[in-house]
Amino acid sequence: MVEYAHSKPVDPEEWTVIDAENAVLGRLASVVAKRILKGERIAVINTEKAIITGKKNTIKEEWLQKIQRGDPKKGPFYPRRPDLIFRRVVRGMLPWKTKRGREAFKRLRAYIGTPRWVEEANIEPERVAEADMSRLGHLWYVTLGELSEELGYQMPGGQ
C-alpha cells in the first residue's frame, strides 16, 4: 500500500472496509454508491484488482477517448490511477450536483492495496457477493491496475 501525503488518520470503527479484488467495477460501484448515500462510511481496498468486463483493447480505447476528450486546462479531467478511477465511477452514480451527493462522496475512500490502518486493526474486509467475478459467463476482462498502466500510470512497487 502506498501512503499518500494527503492520507488523513482514520478511526477503523467508523468505516466499513470492502475488498474490490475480483469484483466487477460497475456492480461494486453501484452498491457502494447506494450505501454512502444512506450515510455509511466506506473504504474500498485493492481497487487495482477490480475488473472491467470486455475486451482489453476496446476498454483501453474508450478510456483514452474520455481522457483526451477535454481541454487539458479546463477538463473534463479523468484520472489514470486505479483508486481515483474507482472514485470517478462511483461519482458518476451519485447526484454530484447536489449537496447530498457531494456529502456522500466525502464518505468514500479508495485505496491501492491494503492500507496500514486496516492491517493494524485486523479488520476482515467485506466482499460484495453481487459484484463477484465468478458470476461472469466469459473470460474477457481487464483489471483496473492493467488499465491504469495502459493509460500511462506507473504502479508503485511494480505491482
From Swiss-Prot:
InterPro entries: Ribosomal_uL13 (IPR005822), Ribosomal_uL13_bac-type (IPR005823), Ribosomal_uL13_CS (IPR023563), Ribosomal_uL13_euk/arc (IPR005755), Ribosomal_uL13_sf (IPR036899)
Gene Ontology terms, MF aspect: mRNA binding; structural constituent of ribosome
Signal peptide (UniProt feature, chain positions): none
Top-level lineage group: Archaea
UniProt cross-references to Gene3D superfamilies, sorted A to Z: Ribosomal protein L13
Keywords from the UniProt entry: Ribonucleoprotein, Ribosomal protein
Any one GO BP annotation for this protein: translation
Record has Ribosomal protein as a keyword: yes
GO CC terms in record: cytosolic large ribosomal subunit
PANTHER family: LARGE RIBOSOMAL SUBUNIT PROTEIN UL13 (PTHR11545:SF3), RIBOSOMAL PROTEIN L13 (PTHR11545)
Family the UniProt entry places it in: Belongs to the universal ribosomal protein uL13 family.
Subunit annotation: Part of the 50S ribosomal subunit.
Role: This protein is one of the early assembly proteins of the 50S ribosomal subunit, although it is not seen to bind rRNA by itself. It is important during the early stages of 50S assembly.
Name of this protein: Large ribosomal subunit protein uL13
Organism expressing this protein natively: Methanopyrus kandleri (strain AV19 / DSM 6324 / JCM 9639 / NBRC 100938)
Gene from which the chain derives: rpl13
